Amino acid sequence: MSTTADFQQMLRXADLRVTRPRVAVLHAVHXXTRDADTETIIRSVREDLPEVSHQAVYDSLHALTAAALVRRIQPSGSVVSRYESRIGDNHHHVVCRSCGAIADVDCSXAGSAPCLTASEDHGFEIDEAEVIYWGTCPECSVAPSR
């Protein structure tokens, strides 16, 4: 688990100003056991900073995502953004079509990102491949149909 000093150093290394909301948001994303949505992050941040506004959390998430300190995930058709601290590695996500649960899926190919190779790059310098697998989670698979 990272400490407040670690989060402050992460912000400085990314040339971001160290603020209490940014440190609290980093802590909330890193402390989450799974990809956290914005409401979960806001609740977590408010445990330490009860006066923090929704906008301060959204602004912090935007800055942290732009600086590649957190990763934003928003599967197609989802209105909810989720954030994770697992960045810069070869992993993707699987999403349950029924309940929306999301889990990490490691790439089968080891090495640096991207783990997939495009058949044509059209002159782009590709540095990431985003794959979302869709299916039904174990809980929904055994749930009785309505």
Curated annotation (Swiss-Prot):
GO terms for biological process: negative regulation of DNA-templated transcription; regulation of secondary metabolite biosynthetic process. Keywords: Cytoplasm, DNA-binding, Iron, Metal-binding, Repressor, Transcription, Transcription regulation, Zinc. It is found in: Cytoplasm. InterPro entries: FUR, Fur_C, WH-like_DNA-bd_sf, WH_DNA-bd_sf. CDD domains: Fur_like (cd07153). Zn(2+) binds at residues 96, 99. Its main location: cytoplasm. GO terms for cellular component: cytoplasm. One of its GO terms (molecular function) is transcription cis-regulatory region binding. It holds the Pfam family FUR. PANTHER family: TRANSCRIPTIONAL REGULATOR FURA, ZINC UPTAKE REGULATION PROTEIN. Acts as a global negative controlling element, employing Fe(2+) as a cofactor to bind the operator of the repressed genes. Belongs to the Fur family. This is Ferric uptake regulation protein 2. The lineage of its organism: Bacteria, Bacillati, Actinomycetota, Actinomycetes, Mycobacteriales.
